[in-house]
Amino acid sequence: MAVQIENLGSVDRKTTLEFARADLAKLREARLAKVGKTMKVAGFRPGKVPKSMVEKQYGMQVDFELQFDKASDLFYELCQKEGIPLAGQPRLEPKSELEAETIAFDVFFEVLPEVKMGDFSAAEVTKYTTEIGEAEIDRAIDVLRKQQVHYHARGEAGAHGDGGANTAAQNGDQVVIDFVGKLDGVEFAGGKAENFEFVLGEGRMLPEFEAAALGLKVGESKSFPLTFPADYHGKDVAGKTAEFTITVKSVNWAHMPVVDDAFALSLGVAEGGVAKMREEVKENLDREVKRRITSLLKSEVMDKLNALCELDVPKSLVTSEQERLVQSARQDLMQRGVPNAKDAPIPAEIFAEQATKRVRLGLILGELVKKQNLAATTDQIKAEIEEQAATYEDPKEVVRWYYSNPSRLKDIENLVLEDNVIKHFTSLAKVVDKAITFEELSKLN
């Protein structure tokens, strides 16, 4: 009997599958016999329970399982035979009684949508360009110097000097203080500490704290009012004004290492000294520039593709993607050490928009790759792996690491595929080159 497929919408379909209950007779008998071997009933040895008792307790369950599996198998055979582009999991609903001679199931399912590609030549994207010069290298080296900063007490002579004649706390200094805060003259929880350390100007403390400590010398104290922000994490004091008193215990000035061959060696530059260090810093900055520019262009191209293409997104695919995002969120919580993260009640609805966008873009890319033959080639994958491996100390080991794991290879394949899509899109769209500084590039999301 020919199977009819009913069109319920742009991607929604329905079909009815029928088969004779007798077709399952042998499977049913074997399944019940298997259940009977492990069934435990008082008064009977294992495997000796009468068939009638097995039938009475498990007959309906076995019928349903076998009938559902049979209908599911028939449906997937139908999809393969008819070339149905199934999207997501089908929903099977029994249409007949378990004991009926002819078993029938209604199957509701979705198909992959038609993707209508827009006019890519009408789109405009920005491709940023950034040059790394001596100033950018100097700033990067300053960051590396700050990572090796150490502090000396102001006014005390040492190998690196005494920090100057002014012994008062200045921006950039590390101060150690005792403080106590009171609300209506009464100390409150969390409002008192001894030997509390912070660096002036880093913005780690509330502005009033920094302003009070600035200019004080060791042994000096200062009182000041502090109004906690309304959204302060401590709810007992949020929005309230407390009176704080601080006493400075020590003021320490920052000493950063001199940029010399010894400093270069401390960064792992064994030969070539400062010149080689600057060369490596530039290479790292160039890689970072390339990564950020590629990421920004990719993000804009994907947004333009999303806007230019028309399609109806199958709900089943969105639901599956939401579930994946929920599991990913739980995994993230587990890695952070959050208790009971595995069963955290995370509602899938909060990921609805993100999941829809992901599925939509995935369908667009799939269609574009198929139509324009943009799939990643073996040579492209190899070239990408070798390029990434070249930045490591042992490139051959990194190459082996990638090829030893199919999941890692798949990640590289997807990376190359996305690059192919970007190249195809930008070959058709209007690309506007825009030169910006490294600092400006760093601020772009």
UniProtKB/Swiss-Prot annotation:
Occurrences of domain PPIase FKBP-type (ranges): 172-257
CC per GO annotation: cytoplasm
Keyword Chaperone listed: yes
Record field: catalytic activity: [protein]-peptidylproline (omega=180) = [protein]-peptidylproline (omega=0)
Main localisation: cytoplasm
tRNA-binding as UniProt keyword: no
Places the protein is found: Cytoplasm
Keyword annotations of the record: Cell cycle, Cell division, Chaperone, Cytoplasm, Isomerase, Rotamase
Source superkingdom: Bacteria
UniProt-listed Enzyme Commission number(s): 5.2.1.8
Gene3D superfamilies membership: 3.10.50.40, Trigger factor ribosome-binding domain (3.30.70.1050), Trigger factor, C-terminal domain (1.10.3120.10)
GO biological process, one term: 'de novo' cotranslational protein folding
GO molecular function: peptidyl-prolyl cis-trans isomerase activity; protein folding chaperone; ribosome binding
Broad enzyme group: isomerase
Pfam families xref list: FKBP_C (PF00254), Trigger_C (PF05698), Trigger_N (PF05697)
Family assignment from sequence similarity: Belongs to the FKBP-type PPIase family. Tig subfamily.
Free-text comment about domains: Consists of 3 domains; the N-terminus binds the ribosome, the middle domain has PPIase activity, while the C-terminus has intrinsic chaperone activity on its own.
PANTHER family cross-referenced by the UniProt entry: TRIGGER FACTOR CHAPERONE AND PEPTIDYL-PROLYL CIS/TRANS ISOMERASE (PTHR30560), TRIGGER FACTOR-LIKE PROTEIN TIG, CHLOROPLASTIC (PTHR30560:SF3)
Function as written in the Swiss-Prot or TrEMBL entry: Involved in protein export. Acts as a chaperone by maintaining the newly synthesized protein in an open conformation. Functions as a peptidyl-prolyl cis-trans isomerase.
Protein name (record): Trigger factor
Species of the source: Polynucleobacter asymbioticus (strain DSM 18221 / CIP 109841 / QLW-P1DMWA-1)
Gene assigned in the entry: tig
